[in-house]
Amino acid sequence: MDNTAITSQSSSTPLVCSVTPIIVGSPPSPANVIELSSPSTPPTPLTLLASLSETPSRKTTNPDTNGENTICHGVRQVRRVPRNNPVTGPSKEHKQRTRSPKTTTRREIKIVEGDRLIVGHDKREKKGETTKRMKKRDGVADKKLYARVSKVKSSENLDLDAKIPSSKVCNNTLPLVGDDMDNGSSELKLEQAIKRRHDWTPTREVTTPVVDVAELHSSPCGKAVTRMHGVGTLLSDYGFSGVVETSLGTKSESFRNAPTTKRPMELQKFSTVPAIPTPTESSTTEDVQGSSSKQQRVKAKKPQKGKLTTITSHATAKYCVADQTVDLDYIQNVAPKSPRRKNISNRPSGTKHSNSGRGKSSTLKNDNGRPVFRVVPPLEAFKSFEGQELLFGTSSQLERGYPEYPCDETQDTQNSPSNSAAVSELAVPYRISSEGKDLGSSLFGLSGSKNLWSASARDLTGAVFEGDEIDFQGASMGLSVLATKSRCHPGNRGPPRRNLVDVDNVPDKKLDIDTTEGENGNHSSVADNIVDRENLNPKISANTSETNLECAPQNKPAFSRFTTSELAKKVAAYGFKPIKSRDNMISLLEKCWETQSKTLILESKPNQGTDDARKNGFRKENHSDVRVRPDSATLANRRSPKKQQAKALSKFQEPNNFLPIENSTTTASMLPIISSHTILINDDQLSDSVGETVSFLPSLDHNGNGTTIQENMLEIKSPATPNARRSRQGSSSASFSIEPPSLASQITKAIKSQPRTRAFNGLKQPTWYEKILMYDPIQLEDLAAWLNTDGFGRIGEDREVGPGVVREWCESKGVCCVWKKQVSGRSHYLPMVS
């Protein structure tokens, strides 16, 4: 009930106000009642308002309690109570009005524990109603006392406070919050109300409250302190008090050095690390640590500078120094060195003399140990770009990475007559004229060359080259051995065999010309030509044998200069088992070479004899009715008289075949021979494109003069190549013997039959078949040289192949192949078959 309601009802209802102070621990006494007004004289509204402004409000709050001095202030409460109507609820007090003017006096006192004590006339009220009313008023009183601020007693009650006996005062007092009030309300000495929180989340207490148990037990008011601490703690959780602010402040102060979730742990290292010393303050221990760390870095980098075994390491070896980045640790270690030198120079004479040698050696080692980083000028940087090479790419890019040769060699190749030197280069897979320069730079890749073959590091057999076992003299001799074998072998093309006369074809055609003239009356010319031919054949055979004999002993390789690995490869190439002794390998290779050179000399003569026998046998079958005449002196010694007679008859009767009027049957039988020669020469023109011009017979001479016919057929402006001779021999022999297997199948068989060689120094030597499976680009010249020297010998194949045939085989099988060197566009397509 507020003041307006009291004012409106004060005229009709007499009020009795009384204050009863009660001390905790003492029974209440009705004698301590001071009535402010008499019931006989009710106050007027003006006096009531004046008394309300000076006295406390009608409701009470928690008394001022400090833990030691527990003083309960009784607060006068004005109530308007109906006489004989029980109060059933707080809302009925406003609605119900009493008709009788008789009033009752009720004194209500609030104690700390929340109990109520009513002192007054209880005779006019029933006990049941009173107790029931009091139970309902408990909740109302609790709610009203919880949220209001009570005023302190006025000056009229000061005398009453003096009469109240004071209890023992405790030290732990709760101060009154009245300092921040206004001047007008400072006399009231109000206690600050608890602030409400808008969000009902209790504040977490970081600091744990510490309670001294001994002090509580020693103090007489310890029980009250603990009791008030429990109530205050519950209420402070829902209000903004100073305890929460101080707890936040103590948290930041107490945990200043502790790590938090948002502070990285690495920052704590800076608190323990001492300050960076200046160069003048640096000690010898720092220098020792710097040198030790430097040595550790050098040791860590040393294993990377081992033997270069890959293409990438070979290619990037010369760029390693330029690609090194700046070492910041090294720059920091250089700074303390300069003051140390000054200290050495400023030392006394005795100390300087004793440590001068060590100091000097250490400085020299430090200066020469690591190269000084130098910034390259722009012009030099651009020049270095020009020197760089394209290292990786497709097979077409690899094909362009040919070794660099001098320009004079290419000019000599272009200016040679009928470009025969270009043809001979196929038989010699490596350059011999520039052995001292190109072997070290372009083939082995040890002097920083700029081609791809040096980076691949392949040896003469096409296997991976071993860089630590290089012998330039032995390698050059190995090249010369391959070159001489290719030159001296009758199947290969070379400069010594370039200008030889074909004994089998040219004299026969001369004989045909002369015998035709003899049939017309000039018989003496036939005998003269036969004599000339007999004289010519021994000379030519002697010349060929001399060239073979001269070619073999001069080019005998010096096996003593070969390395052990090369000797083992040579022994394995001949089909022998590995030999441990170096001397035994050298002696075995010399014997093998001697026997091979002898077989090469002897093979040249039987080949000529067999070719003549094949031709004569072909002519004998076609012409059985001819006279016997000796062929030549050299062939007469080896053959039986029957073969000599048959050959002589065929040679003597051949000119008659060219006269169609006299003998038409012989003309018809001879036409296939003419057509076969014509077709073969025409094929040589298409395949070799050497530039041969042969004028063929447009029509036969019906007058019987066949000289013009033979002259036109033999009008060849350029010498016939060995390929043409081989093709003639093959065509003539193929018609009477079983055709041999194709070269493609023989190449496949030879490559698959190559045995696996031993690994030298832990490096495996792959075979040709393994290289093909690994998609390693196959060099056509190397594979052709291996097939002619070793591959075909394992499978019993006598023929030989050139790079052109090998290229056709590679393209048919899908093998990646490249040319080792490019001499001209036409030479790549020259097939070489024997």
UniProtKB/Swiss-Prot annotation:
- One Pfam family named in its UniProt record: Slx4
Region Disordered, annotated ranges: 80-105, 272-307, 332-372, 401-421, 603-649, 720-740
Superkingdom as given in the UniProt entry:
Eukaryota
Among its keywords, does the record have ATP-binding?
Answer: no
Keywords associated with the record: DNA damage, DNA recombination, DNA repair, Nucleus, Phosphoprotein
Quaternary structure and partners: Forms a heterodimer with SLX1.
* Protein name, as recorded: Structure-specific endonuclease subunit SLX4
Species of the source: Ajellomyces capsulatus (strain NAm1 / WU24)
